[in-house]
A protein has these predicted regions:
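Conserved PLP-anchoring active-site segment centered on the Schiff-base-forming lysine
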Residues: 72-94
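Short glycine-rich anion-binding loops that position phosphate/pyrophosphate groups of nucleotides
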Residues: 2-3, 63, 134-138
Length: 177
């Protein structure tokens, strides 16, 4: 996304200092060890998980992350549950891999929460993965805790991999969680 505010000065300063320190060459395809360590630390502190830096993979953006996560697990003929509306890469990537995107609706009249009756009716023996974008792009809707808990139950019961796009998780307002 493209926020309507400038990059914070401390980020610009850190980039400038990094360039001046000679950090201009290729790094590990997994991301720098220091960055991976900080990401693991942040996830552990904010999401009550226990990741090691070795479990973190840094990509150049959501496009690469989408492709890598889907290419690693999908096979031709698999189905992927994808919210509608959604960023189009979640439709194009599985299609390019020979998998079939199957959409589930996020409707304004339902406060952009998942209609679980509809979702469960779309799960077949070919369903391998579900995509969750929270907060939603493009609606801005945020799933309630109840929605996320029920979604977790469905994913576990049906042995579905979950691709969770949380790129906008720190851009929530008005007391939303």
């Amino acid at each position: 996304g493209r926020p309507d505010f400038d990059t914070p000065k401390k980020i610009k300063d850190a980039a400038y200092e990094s360039l001046n320190a000679g950090h201009v060459f290729y790094t590990s395809n997994y991301g720098t060890p220091a960055l991976r360590k900080e990401i693991a630390k942040w996830e552990n502190e904010h999401h009550n998980v226990n990741y090691e830096a070795s479990e973190v993979l840094v990509t150049v953006g959501v496009g690469e992350a989408t492709y890598a996560s889907m290419a690693a697990f999908l096979e031709e003929g698999d189905e992927v549950l994808v919210p509608n509306p959604v960023w189009l890469n979640y439709i194009h990537v599985p299609s390019s891999l020979g998998a079939t995107p199957v959409t589930y609706s996020l409707k304004e009249e339902n406060d952009y929460q998942i209609d679980f009756e509809e979702l469960e009716s779309k799960i077949t023996e070919k369903t391998k993965m579900i995509v969750v974008v929270n907060p939603s792009n493009p609606t801005g809707g945020i799933f309630s805790r109840k929605t996320l808990e029920k979604l977790s139950e469905i994913a576990i019961r049906n042995d579905l991999l979950v691709v969770s796009d949380e790129i906008y998780s720190q851009l929530v307002y008005d007391g939303a969680e």
